[in-house]
């Protein structure tokens, strides 16, 4: 309201007395400080009260002497243009401490080795699960500690296989030893070849082991074949009982002997 009243008086004086006289009156009547506008000062930056002060050490200026050092001042003494300049800094938000300044002026690499029990920040990848005591990676690959708890560490995977696989290996070895003992100790029951449910991978051969005849048995069978190439059922039973053979064995031997004799006679006819 004071500014509009002063402008109104200025226009009234210029209309009545003229422009030159109005300028002289306005200079004497209205001092520079009465309009409520503070004089423009040098461009000094002040920190915004909502942001925490920067904790990094001051380094050499990059842009020359045009950048003035930052002074702590109240929010009422900063012009609107300076506030507008502050809003163009997108990285002024509070951040996690990345590096801590050492007393000798160097930055310590605190992000490489996080302390045990530290909290992980959301959205930031972590190289080691926090809350676990870091173990040295210089352990030999064969010296793997047993897994007493469910917590996992990097050294568990440096031994060649995950802990779950190492737990399964002893049980599998014991199972294979038991199978070997069972196979060597007792004979398995014979598998029925007519059973379609039997697995052909584990089924044994159904062919019986070849049982060669003794010299005595062969000689007696040859004598009987010379007398009669075909045996009756009663005579086959008697021969099998005398030679300690089954009737089927006697029958098969006579069939094979007849086929052999037929082949010999055929070859002899070709030679003649």
Curated annotation (Swiss-Prot):
The modification Symmetric dimethylarginine is found at residue 140. It comes from Homo sapiens (Human). Residues 206-265 bind DNA. It holds the Pfam family Hox9_act. Sequence-specific transcription factor which is part of a developmental regulatory system that provides cells with specific positional identities on the anterior-posterior axis. Required for induction of SELE/E-selectin and VCAM1 on the endothelial cells surface at sites of inflammation. Positively regulates EIF4E-mediated mRNA nuclear export and also increases the translation efficiency of ODC mRNA in the cytoplasm by competing with factors which repress EIF4E activity such as PRH. InterPro entries: Abd-B_homeobox_TF, HD, HD_metazoa, Homeobox_CS, Homeodomain-like_sf, Hox9_activation_N, HXA9/HXB9/HXC9. Belongs to the Abd-B homeobox family. Its main location: nucleus. Transmembrane segments: none annotated. Transiently interacts with PRMT5 in TNF-alpha stimulated endothelial cells. Interacts with EIF4E. GO terms for biological process: anterior/posterior pattern specification; definitive hemopoiesis; DNA-templated transcription; embryonic forelimb morphogenesis; embryonic skeletal system morphogenesis; endothelial cell activation; male gonad development; mammary gland development. It comes from the Eukaryota. The record marks 163-164 as: Breakpoint for translocation to form MSI2/HOXA9 fusion protein. SUPFAM superfamilies: Homeodomain-like (SSF46689). It is linked to A chromosomal aberration involving HOXA9 is found in a form of acute myeloid leukemia. Translocation t(7;11)(p15;p15) with NUP98. The chimera includes NUP98 intrinsic disordered regions which contribute to aberrant liquid-liquid phase separation puncta of the chimera in the nucleus. This phase-separation enhances the chimera genomic targeting and induces organization of aberrant three-dimensional chromatin structures leading to tumourous transformation. It is found in: Nucleus; Cytoplasm. This is Homeobox protein Hox-A9. The record marks 163-164 as: Breakpoint for translocation to form the NUP98-HOXA9 fusion protein. Residues 155-198 are annotated as: Disordered. Keywords: Chromosomal rearrangement, Cytoplasm, Developmental protein, DNA-binding, Homeobox, Methylation, Nucleus, Proto-oncogene, Transcription, Transcription regulation. PROSITE patterns: HOMEOBOX_1 (PS00027), HOMEOBOX_2 (PS50071).
């Amino acid at each position: 309201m004071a500014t509009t009243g002063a402008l109104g008086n200025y226009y009234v004086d210029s209309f009545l007395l003229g422009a030159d006289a109005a300028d002289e009156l306005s200079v004497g009547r209205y001092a520079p400080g009465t309009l409520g506008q503070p004089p423009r000062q040098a461009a000094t930056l002040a920190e915004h009260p909502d942001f925490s002060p920067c904790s990094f050490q001051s380094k050499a200026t990059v842009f020359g002497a045009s950048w003035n050092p930052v002074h702590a001042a109240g929010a009422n003494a900063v012009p609107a243009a300076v506030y507008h300049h502050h809003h163009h800094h997108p990285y002024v938000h509070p951040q996690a401490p990345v590096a801590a300044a050492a007393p000798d002026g160097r930055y310590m690499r605190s992000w490489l080795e996080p302390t045990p029990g530290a909290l992980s920040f959301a959205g930031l990848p972590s190289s080691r699960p926090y809350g676990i005591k870091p173990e040295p990676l210089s352990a030999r690959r064969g010296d793997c500690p047993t897994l007493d708890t469910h917590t996992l560490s990097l050294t568990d995977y440096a031994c060649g296989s995950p802990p779950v696989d190492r737990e399964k290996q002893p049980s599998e070895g014991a199972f294979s030893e038991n199978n070997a003992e069972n196979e060597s100790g007792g004979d398995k029951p014979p598998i029925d070849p007519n059973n379609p449910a039997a697995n052909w991978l584990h089924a044994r051969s159904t062919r019986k082991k070849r049982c060669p005849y003794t010299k005595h048995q062969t000689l007696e069978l040859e004598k009987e074949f010379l007398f009669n190439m075909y045996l009756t059922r009663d005579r086959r039973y008697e021969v099998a009982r005398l030679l300690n053979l089954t009737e089927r064995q006697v029958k098969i031997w006579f069939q094979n002997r007849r086929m052999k004799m037929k082949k010999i006679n055929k070859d002899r006819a070709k030679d003649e």
